Amino acid sequence: MGVLSKFVIAVAATTAVFAPFAYATRPMENLGRGVVAVRSNETAVLVGWRLLGLDDEDIGFNVYRATGSGDPKLLNSKVLTGGTNFQDLSPDLGESNTYHVRPVLNGKEEAESGTFTLTADHDEEPLVRIPIKAGGAIKFLWVGDLDGDGEYDYVIDRQTAPSTIEAYRSDGTFLWEVNMGPNSENQNNIEPGSSALNVGNWDGMTVFDFDSDGKAELAVRIANGVVFGDGKTFDDGDSDDDQYVAFINGETGALRATAKIENDYLSDGPLAARFGVGYLDGKTPHLVAFLKNRQPGQGAFNLIMAAWTFDGKAVDLAWRWLRGDQAASDGHNTRIIDLNGDGKDEVCEIGFALNGDGSLRYSLSDQGVGHGDRFHIAKMDPSADGLQGYGIQQDNPDLLMEYYYDADTGKLIWKHYGDEVGDVARGMAGDIDPTTPGMEVWSFSGVYNAGSNKLTEEDTTLAPWPQLGLWWNGDALLELYNDGKIEHWDWENPSVSGKLPRYFKIGDYGGSVGTRNPLFIGDILGDWREEFVVTNADFDELLIFSTNFPSDIRLYTLAHNPAYRNAMTLKGYMQSHHVDYFLGDGMETPPKPDISYVGA
């Protein structure tokens, strides 16, 4: 089992009232409490809920349960002021049990925000099942509050030809489908069709409330032949290689607005895309696109970075950046995060970073960094200023394998070299060892403490597989997701990656490993810990895994952390999300996020 937390984190917060749509800070989702309940063992139920980013530091909670058709009864003997979860030790599991929580502030109980019902004779499993329509394989899921009720709804892709997109309310109610048309049928993972989605490292879509009206939109790259949720077909392009960014109504699937993607390399074909979201001016959500195509004969890649805003009526191009012959290496995932603490997000690739205005902030090429598959930016060293980055390399001619750097300036702090050219392929960052301060980083050459550049285990064969991490078991250390297995690193008894202590496999509950990654990882229900979503083998059910471990740690929902919420919009080669403060063993109380709630 993991280490039990030895501390309780209190979140400093204040309440405030903001004028609708006039935001001095970044507007973020006006979330509800996200109440969830799962069986924690044979006789008990774990109930979890959100602490919100702007909750008062003195807020407490009461938990209520209604059994069957009975009236709600208070479960806790005193107001709960620790972790935002509660273990119900005496439910009648033969009946349905409906839970809700009520905030308590200054001795006054406030209104409830949503309920969750655990059905009678529910299986003992750490997950919520959401039935969906039968259909083709699913690669990714995005979340956003499509209907404005304060809870996350779901948007999925279908790996069919043509590709399709489906939207569901949080309870599984089907909303709409978008058919990506004949130009999505070319699903080559390097040079896909002009409206193809989610092949290779390309996604070409994301979900967010771009106009800050309280309801999320789908942003997607489209071309001729796309059929929207209201049945209308898009045909504005002069040719099938003409592409557009489209903002689609999250409730209806109808088109709201488009902007043509300027393709300076149209003679080389349509542009493949990765999408994400950042507040590049500090207060306005921007759609950020990483766009590439390839010159003939397996030639060089053309790269365009671009950003747009959507105000509810029109789409405006904020900027474009063309790499051209500049030395600036890219990879297979993007990070959008405020590097210098000025409130404005930067756009980061594995080998360079752009400022929020689209200008080049720095390139790592002059320090020997080239293409690689994965990189991370986080508060890895709590004793150092700012944020740090860690990346790995693919076939670096100078034999560079992995590196660690100052994410604000791009200055490399340490490098590790190999004996021959090789593709490192995987790299992870997270706090998995409480005996050293800060995060660990690792690929396939051992686990290193990031800040000190020292091995935590001299035998470098004893290391976890560097795939994905998630907070799960109740302490502040990171657990591990690898190929459908939830595991943790036992720093006292290190082992090879195939023999780590394991909590469960998703197959134990009918989950399909699929592409070996989940459809989504992120904090979308309950307290601050993360959920992950997979599907069953028939692709007609979403399995949303949510922790069944109690925790004393009190943190505001990770979805109200600016860096983390940006990360939830990104796919590419799926990577773990990070907050902009140090989250790990021995952490300090994180600062209150500088946000406002839309519509508050």
Regions found by a protein language model. Name each.
Residues M1-I9:
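Bacterial N-terminal signal peptides that target proteins for export
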Residues A10-V11, A22:
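Cleavable N-terminal signal peptides
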Residues T25-R33, E42-A44, L51-D56, A66-L74, ...:
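Beta-propeller-forming repeat regions
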Residues A37-V38:
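Intrinsically disordered, low-complexity regulatory segments in eukaryotic proteins
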